[in-house]
Each structure stands twice: as C-alpha cells, then as structure tokens.
C-alpha cells in the first residue's frame, strides 16, 4: 500500500548557498507549489551554522541566524492554507561537534541534522580510508553521536554517504542488521526521527550506481526498531520539490 506523503519538511530556499534556483525558489513559490500538489505541511530547512564554540567553514560562515530572520520576514507577507514550519538543516564537523546549539534549536519548530556530509573534505572529519568498511564505521559513529546530541528532531538523509555514492550499496551492506538495530534503537530511545528522502531514489537520468533495495533495507530496520519518520524532498528547486510523491510508492 502506498504511503500518504502529506508533508515535506526538507525544503531549501534561495537563502541556502546551495539553492539551484535562487531567483525563483522562494517561500511564496514553494508554498504555492505545495498547495497545488496537495502537500499540507512545508518545513523550511535552510543551512545554518550557529555554534560559536566551533569555527564554521567558509561556506557556512555566512549562513547563520540571519537565515531564519530573513525567512520569517518573507513568510510574514504570505497567506497560505499550507501549514508552515520554520526549521533548519544543521551539520556535524565530527562526532560530538555540532553546527548548532541546543539553545538555538529551541528557537525553531524542528531541526534536521546531517550526519553524512563527507563530501566537505576540508571541513568534516573523514574516514580512515575510502573503503566500504571504513565509511560504514564512520557513518555509524556520526549517526550515533547525532541522535544523542539533543539538537536533532530528525536525521537528514540518514546513512547516505555524500561524496561516496558510487559505493553506496557496498557501504550499507557493510553495516550488519545488528549494528543498524543498535543505531536505530538509540534514535528511537532519544525520540529522533528518520528522514525518508528523495535522495534515496536512484537518478532517472545517467547511470544508476545504487539499488533502491539499499535504502529500503535500512528503513525497514529503522521501522522495526521503533523509529518515527519524516518525509523530505531535500528540494533545492521546484523540480526537486515535485519529486516528493515518489516517496509514497
């Protein structure tokens, strides 16, 4: 049976430096498209770094609390039947090193925490070696730290090895069911949800370097461990946002 995907709580706007369409991907357009698609709740999740104890990267330095201030200013002029949540996508530099504080997280409706931005090679701690086993251990270390952090509502694109997608199948296969059970059990115990993301879907164009069975196995084990789930398109443009219904199939 298809799932009912009535919310999208991972949407970036023009405020995120990685936005693919800064001219058009603005809150009013995002909410209009959500209404057209029948999506009842939109959560805005621009990148933010708000932890003065940890120096941000150059990319993150200009993405601070002003992101939230500007977003709220934009939203104040919009009238929509779509429920609006103001959140962010926060990051980790290493286990125990988070891009936001608990105090900052408390000012938002929710927070997504990324535990796998390994493509930021000059900023995020890297695995011992570029092998499936080492990457698997690195993902587990980041994830278990993230779910215990006290700053995460949901884990963004969990166990998605950014920068190493050619090895995605092999990396996840290197994580045993028992290891996943422990990791997801910790998430459930800490009431941290798991994101079901469009990033799990193999690309429509170009070579398919991973099987849909890889994220399907992981999500099945998360469900067995008692985890809650959030849906997210991880949209950086309208084209990405339109892919959300694919998660219900």
Q: Positions of the model-derived regions?
A:
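An N-terminally biased module of ancient metal coordination in phosphate/nucleic-acid-related enzymes
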Residues: 1-94, 103, 164-174, 183, ...
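Domain-core and long-helix interface of multi-subunit machines
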Residues: 14-16, 110-225, 235
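Residues at alpha-helix caps and immediate loop-helix transition turns in enzyme cores, especially N-
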Residues: 26, 97, 210-214, 243
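Generic secondary-structure boundary signal with a strong preference for alpha-helix termini
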Residues: 203, 245-246
């Amino acid at each position: 049976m298809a799932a009912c995907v009535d919310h999208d709580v991972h949407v970036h706007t023009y405020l995120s430096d990685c936005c693919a369409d800064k001219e058009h991907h603005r809150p009013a357009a995002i909410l209009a498209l959500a209404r057209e698609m029948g999506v009842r709740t939109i959560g805005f999740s621009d990148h933010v770094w708000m932890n003065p104890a940890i120096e941000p990267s150059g990319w993150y330095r200009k993405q601070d609390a002003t992101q939230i201030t500007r977003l709220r200013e934009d939203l104040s002029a919009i009238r929509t039947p779509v429920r609006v949540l103001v959140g962010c996508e926060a990051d980790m530099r290493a286990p125990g090193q988070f891009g936001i504080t608990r105090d900052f997280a408390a000012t938002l409706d929710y927070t997504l925490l990324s535990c796998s931005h390994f493509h930021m090679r000059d900023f995020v701690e890297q695995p011992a070696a570029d092998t499936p086993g080492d990457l698997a251990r690195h993902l587990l270390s980041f994830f278990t730290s993230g779910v215990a952090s006290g700053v995460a509502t949901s884990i963004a694109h969990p166990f998605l090895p950014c920068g190493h997608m050619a090895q995605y199948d092999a990396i996840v296969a290197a994580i045993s069911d028992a290891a996943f059970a422990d990791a997801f059990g910790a998430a459930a115990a800490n009431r941290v949800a798991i994101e079901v993301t469009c990033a799990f879907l193999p690309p429509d164009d170009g070579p398919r370097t991973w099987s849909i069975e890889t994220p399907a196995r992981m999500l099945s084990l998360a469900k067995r461990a008692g985890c809650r789930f959030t849906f997210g398109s991880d949209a950086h443009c309208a084209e990405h946002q339109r892919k959300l219904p694919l998660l219900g199939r």
